[in-house]
């Protein structure tokens, strides 16, 4: 809870509090937290859209592996920064994407925390068919139909609809994050980045060209 509040309100955890947490860890009390409690805190983190900061704080406190051993090392850094008002279910799916090629860890994570079956099923389907879902509009009929079969589309299942809706948000989130990165990089190119011999309109033209040249690195 302390980590969640620190992530939400962006405050520094006092050294005394950090020591208390380390003492609790040393005594093994963290190992006795019930899975339902961990999942409850995680759902609140989803609603607050702060799970990146949340995991980062747990890592800094050296308790991440005690509470969420499946999210090993700095794997949480791969979680895409989300958008506001994204549903809890799709927030969970964003978290699930860090288990790409590590489905066994994802299943262990879900089973240990008693993740709702609906979330687990959707996350597993997305992981198993991530590349095809990303490239869905370019799939040939055979590969599309395979997705329909796997998702139970013809049995009135919403799995395929939910997966494609999530992929839509996933792409939008990635595009937004990439745009923010590009914006920051291009802003660093200014009058100090071009020859001091240039004058007037030449300066603006040179800055523009350097920014265009930089964009080629993103292709």
Where are these regions (language model features)?
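Glycine- and charge-enriched loop/helix tracts that form the active or gating conduit
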Residues: 1-113
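Charged substrate- and nucleic-acid-binding regions of tRNA-handling and nucleotidyl-transfer enzymes
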Residues: 3-7, 152-219
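A broadly tuned preference for mixed-charge, low-complexity surface segments
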Residues: 9, 19, 42, 49-67, ...
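Short, surface-exposed acidic
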Residues: 13-17, 65-69, 117-123, 200-207
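A diffuse structural propensity rather than consistent per-protein peaks
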Residues: 14-17, 34, 136-143, 190
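Short, mixed-charge aromatic SLiMs
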Residues: 22-35, 80-83, 112-133, 179-193
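Residue-level marker of positions within ordered structural domains that often coincide
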Residues: 47, 63, 132, 197-199
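Divalent metal-dependent catalytic cores for phosphoryl transfer on phosphate-bearing substrates
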Residues: 67-172
């Amino acid at each position: 809870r302390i980590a969640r509040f620190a992530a939400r309100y962006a405050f520094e955890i006092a050294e005394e509090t950090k020591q208390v947490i380390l003492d609790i860890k040393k005594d093994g009390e963290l190992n006795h937290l019930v899975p339902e409690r961990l999942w409850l805190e995680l759902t609140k983190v989803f609603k607050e859209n702060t799970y990146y900061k949340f995991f980062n704080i747990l890592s800094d406190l050296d308790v991440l592996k005690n509470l969420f051993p499946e999210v090993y090392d700095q794997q949480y850094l791969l979680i895409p920064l989300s958008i506001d008002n994204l549903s809890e279910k799709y927030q969970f799916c964003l978290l699930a994407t860090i288990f790409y090629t590590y489905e066994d860890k994802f299943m262990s994570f879900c089973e240990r925390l008693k993740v709702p079956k609906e979330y687990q099923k959707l996350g597993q389907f997305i992981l198993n068919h991530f590349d095809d879902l990303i490239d869905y509009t370019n799939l040939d009929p055979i590969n599309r139909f395979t997705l329909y079969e796997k998702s139970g589309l013809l049995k009135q299942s919403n799995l395929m609809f939910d997966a494609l809706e999530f992929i839509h948000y996933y792409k939008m989130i990635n595009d937004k994050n990439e745009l923010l990165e590009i914006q920051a990089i291009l802003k660093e190119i200014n009058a100090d980045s071009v020859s001091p011999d240039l004058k007037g309109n030449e300066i603006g033209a040179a800055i523009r060209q350097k920014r265009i040249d930089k964009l080629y690195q993103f292709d």
